[in-house]
Amino acid sequence: EFPALGYRLDYKGRSVVISGDTRPTKNMVKFAAGADVLIHEVHVGLDGSERGGVRPVRGAHHTSPREAGEIFAETKPKLAVYTHIVWGRKSEQDLIDLTRDTYSGPLVVGQEMMQIEIGDKVKVLK
């Protein structure tokens, strides 16, 4: 069993939650509830399906797009961001589409050096 570490940063009424490698857990939902931004890892199987071609140990410690969508839907961040993306041959749009099965809110796929401004509104500056 590997520990799953995540972080919640609260400052002047704003909050950011960053998951580590994790399967879906009640603790993630508990600590991410109401965050302005939830940055979460995601894993897509090597064949582009939810878990296809994934070694059991890897699949057991990551979250699928649909599972992440469920977490986003339950915690209701102003912006959901994917990071530490482990995926097969899918495009970013495919990743978003898989997530849309369970989450319809604001979602972006994180990029190197992406900047996010958190105020009354949350916006990606790039």
Regions found by a protein language model. Name each.
Residues 6, 12-15, 23-113:
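Cap/insert and terminal regions of metallo-dependent hydrolase folds
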